Amino acid sequence: LDIDFTIISRSDSTLRGHYPTETQVIYDVLKQNHIHIDGEILCPYLDGIRRTENDIHYVLVNDVWVPVGKTEFAKDKTFSFQSSNLKEYVEEKTNKAYLASSCISLSIADLQDESLVVSKLNSVSGFRKVIVNCTCMQDLQKFVSAYEKTDKRYIFRCAASLVKELGHITDSSYLEKEDCINDGLGGLILVG
């Protein structure tokens, strides 16, 4: 392809699903085709019901923020996991192929300094994992603003809120057929 593109792995769920197999296969196929990927960004934030703070991912359950490793999602029979800390989750799910200590964390405080986030993202290589902490849409918007200024290419493993921000999609009513047909604006490929 002679066009720039972004790969976003959404799967069944950000943390459940065939992780890390899906993103690793995507990475391997791109590498075989001489397309360089620097890292993988994990951002399971979902507005109003999921948040990540100090690398711990939480799910809102009955008005209480519960570490994801203690929820029903972590006990899924096919895709179970124990870690609520996303760095440890990466280590757990990759069977230590990527250690928690090798993950780069973008804290809430980091997100307040765009140049710091750009610098951290530009330092990534070797398909290292980047954990994005977000507690609100403003955090996510700050991350996207910094990401768009980087020189690197990533595969994303994320929830729907990040897709919306990366695509600069505003809230609107459902699309009509006429809204979807426009040959000049690129496209979206869905596989499922």
Label every model-predicted segment:
Residues 139-142, 151:
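Extended, basic/helix-rich recognition subdomains
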Residues 1-7, 11-140:
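Cap/lid and interdomain-hinge subdomains that line or gate substrate/regulatory clefts
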Residues 147-192:
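Acidic, glycine-rich loop-and-beta core segments that form the ion-binding/anion-interacting portion
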Residues 90, 145-146:
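Short, aromatic/basic amphipathic alpha-helical patches
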